[in-house]
Design a protein with these regions (language model features):
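Rossmann-fold dinucleotide-binding core
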Residues: 1-41
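Helical "substrate-binding/catalytic lid" subdomain
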Residues: 31-161
């Protein structure tokens, strides 16, 4: 996610390609930051949605592994369900399988959601889901879970089980 004029982008692209496999020119200066804010807004919302769905399925009695199998081969599939599923042991490499340690901290997701809500306010763009999810992550931080991976949002739904 890069914001720069065309000439500058072409000059720095070889260096940036050593830092990541996808180097996307988003527009002028600042456009990369806008893309990051929007991407993380979507990520925060999608993680909360996956957590909500997984929690509902568990409460209704379906095995979380079976539910994840359905979701990840169906229309609900996304990065949050497949790579970083908030239910422990769906993906052994996910932070949920390590006690929500060593991931993208909840406090960082809260910061990014705050940036998105602020930016939306500046251009008078409603982001209803973003505001709701921001409040959920804020509650997690207030409960002392700011350092946990943001997938720990599932604890808002099933604190006694995960």
């Amino acid at each position: 996610m890069v914001g720069a004029n065309d000439q500058t982008f072409e000059e720095v692209k070889p260096v940036l390609s050593h830092m990541g496999k996808n180097v996307i020119h988003c527009g002028d200066v600042g456009a990369g930051q806008i893309a990051k804010i929007c991407n993380n807004l979507i990520l925060g919302i999608s993680m909360a949605a996956v957590a909500e769905g997984m929690a509902l399925g568990a409460k209704l009695g379906i095995d979380p592994q079976a539910l994840a199998g359905v979701v990840n081969t169906s229309s609900g599939r996304c990065w949050s369900s497949e790579i970083c599923n908030p239910w422990p042991h769906i993906n052994e490499n996910a932070p949920a399988s390590r006690g929500y340690q060593d991931g993208f901290a909840t406090q960082l997701m809260l910061k990014d959601l705050g940036l998105a809500v602020e930016a939306a306010g500046q251009v008078k763009q409603p982001i209803l889901l973003g505001g709701m999810v921001q409040q959920m992550y804020q509650q997690m931080c207030m409960r002392g879970n700011a350092h946990l991976d943001f997938s720990s949002i599932i604890q808002q739904y099933l604190p006694e089980q995960v």
